[in-house]
């Protein structure tokens, strides 16, 4: 149990009456549990202030920094989104240049919009056998930085949504040789570096700014995250200023207690929990090697443990079909589905039953595929079109993100959008990585493939299904 939760619980048992916010006054309101109300307070005496920490919150952030090997750490209650916005805003001047992976989260693009940045993209290589993208390599970074003009900062995602880990140590050396900072969105790697058998985290590898979603892979509440800073390439006062802007002025003590509790669990039980987690996961992978149709991304030196990538390409099925079968027949809710695979996440929060159910279900599905029970939706519909990943395309940039997003726009049929300028982000969600960014020219391949994704029931944001498929574009003059 974390120190902040203990203090909140003890306070709730006193006779002090709250003549202050929040409005529920620690009383039962509707059907929410009383326990939540009891510890949901504001910045009252004795509980510090996240925006000017001096006591318990300062101490907890210092403990987080020691745990991750950072010089300074900040609690975030607005998720990693807040951390990414603050990191990019602090590292890159308004109107500056950012070199970033095309696979960046939409919050990175939002930062570029807000700060009117010019973006240069790094395009990850496709792992063809598994239909997923690898992490950005040091060679790609070196090649990009050899060109002029040199950006003001580099922004990477590691691990990727699918668990691919970049060689941050080498990349940091290359980036720093140019005198610029490295920002790593490590939202999916809050567990890294915390136990034997896990890869190092990016703080330990020399990154200047690192963002962790504590809730993604550790036992914390949704929306809780951390931002770490190292070295002298980042103005700390400037970083704090942007955190004040992007972070709520009424930070949730429930969420902060959750961060503290999760990190306390790691400190007290992490060795045992992570060892058990790795044993269970590897045992599951061994059993799943019996599958003849489904395949799984193997654990190599650059693959994060816990991300089970269920590849359905060889079976002739879409990732969405496997996702739907697991949900509807076996009541197993996965993280996401993509055209050629789906993703199940495992953490120290999973017991042996979670591994058994997933193993049994996938082995049964694999047997059903062999027996011809499942057929691809394309074959069912009489469609046999070759699919291309839209992330492989390098759309022509016709306007900056800020220009396009602020321009007058209109909604038109997707089939009529070829050659037009995208007026909004279009992405598969999750994870929210854009296939089209405002200001980019829409190609015929975009229109055709987006329509295919929608027919496969993939969650495409930025294209509506009202009165046929429609997309937002910049209005012609």
Question: Language model features by range: what are they?
Answer:
Residues 1-36, 427, 431, 463-464, ...:
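N-terminal glycine-rich, Lys/His-bearing helix-loop that initiates the first secondary-structure elements
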Residues 4-11, 31-33, 70, 80-297:
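Conserved PLP-enzyme active-site core in the AAT-like
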Residues 37-79:
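Conserved N-terminal alpha-helix of the aminotransferase class I/II PLP-enzyme fold
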Residues 47, 74-76, 154-157, 309, ...:
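Short glycine-rich or small-residue beta-strand-to-loop segments that form or flank ligand, phosphate
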Residues 75, 121-123, 212, 336, ...:
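Structural signal for conserved beta-strand scaffold positions within catalytic alpha/beta enzyme cores
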Residues 116, 121, 455-466:
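Short, compositionally biased
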Residues 286-441, 448-462:
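Conserved C-terminal alpha-helix-loop-beta "cap" of PLP-dependent enzymes
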């Amino acid at each position: 149990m974390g120190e902040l939760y203990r203090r909140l619980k003890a306070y709730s048992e006193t006779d002090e009456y709250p003549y202050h916010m929040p409005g529920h006054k620690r009383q039962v309101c509707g059907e929410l549990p009383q326990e939540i109300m009891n510890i949901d307070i504001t910045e009252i005496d004795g509980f510090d202030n996240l925006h000017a920490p001096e006591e318990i919150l300062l101490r907890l952030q210092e403990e987080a920094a020691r745990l991750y090997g950072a010089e300074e750490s900040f609690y975030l209650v607005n998720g990693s989104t807040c951390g990414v916005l603050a990191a990019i805003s602090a590292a890159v001047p308004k109107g500056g240049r950012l070199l970033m992976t095309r696979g960046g989260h939409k919050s990175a693009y939002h930062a570029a919009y807000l700060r009117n940045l010019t973006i240069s993209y790094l395009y990850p290589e496709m792992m063809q056998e598994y239909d997923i993208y690898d992490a950005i390599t040091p060679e790609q970074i070196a090649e990009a930085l050899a060109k002029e003009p040199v950006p003001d900062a580099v922004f990477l995602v590691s691990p990727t949504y699918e668990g691919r880990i970049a060689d941050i140590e080498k990349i940091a050396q290359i980036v720093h040789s140019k005198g610029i900072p490295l920002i790593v969105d490590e939202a999916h790697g809050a567990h890294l570096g915390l136990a034997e058998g896990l890869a190092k985290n990016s703080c330990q590898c020399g990154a200047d700014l690192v963002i962790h979603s504590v809730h993604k892979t550790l036992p914390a509440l949704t929306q809780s995250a951390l931002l770490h800073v190292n070295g002298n390439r980042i103005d700390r006062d400037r970083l704090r200023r942007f955190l004040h802007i992007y972070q709520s002025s009424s930070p949730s003590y429930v969420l902060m207690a959750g961060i503290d509790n999760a990190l306390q669990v790691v400190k007290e039980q992490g060795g045992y929990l992570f060892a058990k987690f790795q044993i269970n996961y590897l045992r599951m992978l061994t059993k799943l090697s019996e599958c003849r149709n489904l395949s799984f991304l193997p654990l190599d030196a650059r693959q994060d443990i816990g991300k089970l990538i269920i590849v359905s390409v060889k079976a002739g099925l879409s990732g969405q079909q496997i996702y739907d079968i697991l949900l509807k027949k076996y009541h197993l809710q996965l993280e996401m589905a993509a055209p050629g695979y789906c993703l199940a996440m495992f953490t120290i929060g999973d017991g042996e039953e979670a591994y058994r159910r997933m193993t049994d279900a996938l082995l049964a599905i694999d047997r059903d595929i062999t027996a011809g029970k499942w057929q691809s939706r394309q074959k069912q519909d009489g469609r046999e079109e070759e699919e291309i990943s839209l992330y492989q395309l390098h759309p022509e940039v016709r306007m900056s993100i800020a220009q396009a997003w602020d321009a007058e726009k209109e909604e038109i049929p997707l089939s009529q959008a070829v050659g037009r300028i995208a007026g909004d982000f279009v992405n598969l969600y999750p994870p929210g990585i854009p296939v089209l960014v405002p200001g980019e020219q829409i190609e015929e391949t975009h229109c055709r493939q987006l329509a295919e994704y929608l027919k496969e029931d993939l969650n495409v944001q930025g294209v509506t299904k009202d009165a046929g498929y429609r997309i937002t574009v910049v209005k012609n003059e």
